[in-house]
Amino acid sequence: MPGIKVYPNESFDEAYRRFKKQTDRNLVVTEVSARRFFEPMTEIRKKQKISARKKMLKRLYMLRRYESKL
């Protein structure tokens, strides 16, 4: 779980910004929203398939973009 130490000369806004950044990096909010409701295995596999396809298309796009510059 993320935690920060607030320095004496640091404002609340700065400390809050650091805390938000740390929670975003640790994917705390994403994990909480994912665990909020039960997800059947079929839904998990469906999401994994979609993300794998996105990754593959992104790699293909980058490869074609790189090849066109040669």
Curated annotation (Swiss-Prot):
This is Small ribosomal subunit protein bS21. HAMAP family: Ribosomal_bS21. GO terms for cellular component: ribonucleoprotein complex; ribosome. It comes from the Bacteria. GO terms for molecular function: structural constituent of ribosome. Keywords: Ribonucleoprotein, Ribosomal protein. GO terms for biological process: translation. The keyword Ribonucleoprotein applies. It comes from Campylobacter hominis (strain ATCC BAA-381 / DSM 21671 / CCUG 45161 / LMG 19568 / NCTC 13146 / CH001A). Belongs to the bacterial ribosomal protein bS21 family.
